[in-house]
Amino acid sequence: MATSEAPINLTNQFLIAMPGMADPTFSGSVVYLCEHNERGALGLVINRPIDIDMATLFDKIDLKLEIQPVAHQPVYFGGPVQTERGFVLHDPVGIYVSSLAVPGGLEMTTSKDVLEAVANGSGPHRFLLTLGYAGWGAGQLEDELSRNGWLTVQADPEIIFSVPPEERFAAAIRLLGIDISMLSGDAGHA
């Protein structure tokens, strides 16, 4: 009789690209997984700021930014899917029109009301705004994991919100107790 493996659930985990990641879209990336189930996975790259800050983006979408401390906060490349759309990863505070509560973790909101709340100071104090997201179809992420494409570890919101973006990859690796210089992108090699 065949046994079936229980499906893995990587929701609220970091995906850390292995050094040999061939896809330049994800090379050197850390992805926060907002959702992972039998239909696929959805995550946001948390360590790839782009050449636009909050003030510039808010000008483009006609929102008045009343809170100056966030004006120069960078906007991030969240992934290659729907890159014209904003995704806000934030602490689970406030109620917004279109939010996904990540079990045991944060919230991801796609509705403009969270940006309006951030702009006037009533929104979440800790947030990361991305353009686009990373998505995988059913079984696709599991296949990439089996081919040694990613490391996984329980996410730490402090890395997302308190660590500079250029240090997030190394900080996520440290959660595993691994020295990044000792990793090889090839299975079976040190």
Curated annotation (Swiss-Prot):
GO cellular component terms, A-Z = cytosol
**What does the record list as coiled-coil region(s)?**
none
InterPro entries, alphabetically? AlgH-like
Superkingdom of this entry's organism?
Answer: Bacteria
Supply the Gene3D superfamilies for this chain.
VC0467-like (3.40.1740.10)
Q: Which PANTHER family match?
A: UNCHARACTERIZED PROTEIN YQGE, UPF0301 PROTEIN YQGE
What family does this belong to? Belongs to the UPF0301 (AlgH) family.
Protein name, as recorded: UPF0301 protein Rmet_2743
Q: Which organism is it from?
A: Cupriavidus metallidurans (strain ATCC 43123 / DSM 2839 / NBRC 102507 / CH34)
The organism's lineage is:
Bacteria, Pseudomonadati, Pseudomonadota, Betaproteobacteria, Burkholderiales
